[in-house]
């Protein structure tokens, strides 16, 4: 945890009182004392610092801080991801990783090679996935929570929803081991938002690939090696970010 994240509702008259895992981290990991300063931010809001004003003694685990939010949140990420629903244990890892690396929206959809039981994992009950996104933000010192949208049927997603949003993207990429293009060729030279589609463990089936390419998605391969979904998401995000940064600097 590199930043303590709070909600607007937790701040009262410039003060916040913590009595959960965040307080435990301040006490046990940071070993902070009264008067020490820690990074703090409001989810989907400003960042700044918190000065510790009180640390509970005895059986009290409470930590109180005076909050000074003097920094604007980082700009919104310009990468969104379409993800065929993976196994729950892998989805948890991916949620944390994409929040840490920075995405705007995660579109989670069904696919031919996705087991229907994956939707019953409980992660989507009462937004149970939020804690995993939060862990990624805490790692990256960010406050902007990615949006998550779920689609339990593939065809309504790709035929009805997706055509309504594609105009908002400068580049659209579908990761496919037999794609004919390289990642660098799929990214347009002009800056803008990018939409990346990553399939399930068994990959997208031909019908799904055709649906994406009919919407002007560029099918790209990331090399000869077949990667697990969580590895592919991180590698592709990093590759896109590196290519765009190199172009931005004119190298």
What is each residue range found by the language model?
Residues 206-251:
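Structured adenosyl-cofactor binding patch, chiefly the S-adenosyl-L-methionine
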Residues 1-71:
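N-terminal positively charged helical leader segments and presequences
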Residues 164, 169-208, 217-220:
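Active-site/ligand-binding-proximal alpha/beta "capping" segment
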Residues 42, 110-111, 176-179, 200, ...:
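Short secondary-structure boundary segments
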Residues 72-173:
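RNA substrate-binding interface of SAM-dependent RNA methyltransferases
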Residues 2-3, 37, 62-63, 79-81, ...:
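Structural motif
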Residues 26, 91-94, 208:
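Hydrophobic side chains in well-ordered alpha-helices
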